[in-house]
């Protein structure tokens, strides 16, 4: 636990890089909200083959907030995938999820992963 806390703190300090703390933290909080909204939409949609789209969309929306949002999206995505691996989900699917996460975080259009027929609401 101490190691994880230390890594998160160091990651946060390095992520700020001269930018104001309050701005960075605000971006991170709003970015985490974007990630939660994408996750909630994914659960609500319950649409086959849509998970990569929601991964990319959550990361994209969070990254649009700024460096704090990028940081939050990366931390949340990495922790989620690590937990999935620990619970026995396939490494291949995890790698595909991480590719979608990075796609969105880098500012690329998440609709690249949007499956045909997914309701316009999402």
From Swiss-Prot:
Apolipoprotein of the HDL complex. InterPro entries: Serum_amyloid_A (IPR000096), Synovial_Prolif_Regulator (IPR052464). Residues 105-122 have a biased composition (Basic and acidic residues). Coiled coil: none annotated. Residues 1-18 form the signal peptide. It comes from the Eukaryota. Major acute phase reactant. This is Serum amyloid A-2 protein. PANTHER family: SERUM AMYLOID A, SERUM AMYLOID A PROTEIN. GO terms for biological process: acute-phase response. GO terms for cellular component: high-density lipoprotein particle. PROSITE patterns: SAA. It is found in: Secreted. Residues 90-122 are annotated as: Disordered. Belongs to the SAA family. The modification Pyrrolidone carboxylic acid is found at residue 19. Keywords: Acute phase, Amyloid, HDL, Pyrrolidone carboxylic acid, Secreted, Signal. Expressed by the liver; secreted in plasma. It comes from Oryctolagus cuniculus.
